[in-house]
Amino acid sequence: MTLIVAGTVRIPPENLDRFRPHMVEMMAASRAEDGCSAYGYAEDVGEPGLIHVFEQWRDQAALEAHFKTDHMARWRAAWPGFGVSERRLFAYEVASERPL
């Protein structure tokens, strides 16, 4: 069953310029993983420092494999130095989809 991971994290706006290259690296590495259909971050235009997260995974096994990657470990280890906080991410199981 397809999984969607969606939510937000916060980063102090003054750290965004230094943090963006890490987001780009994480997106590229994650998108290359088997089972990843989509992986992205978006900065909220109305609330500086609020980052929206969207991921799509083939199944739970693919998501669990993602959590065990070296790039995920580096990503999480970098968070304290950039002040990443308020991690609010949720997984959704998708039973079906249709175009809107």
Each language-model region and where it sits:
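N-terminal first-folded block
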Residues: 3-40
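Glycine-rich beta-strand-turn "strand-cap" elements at beta-sheet edges
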Residues: 41-49, 77-100
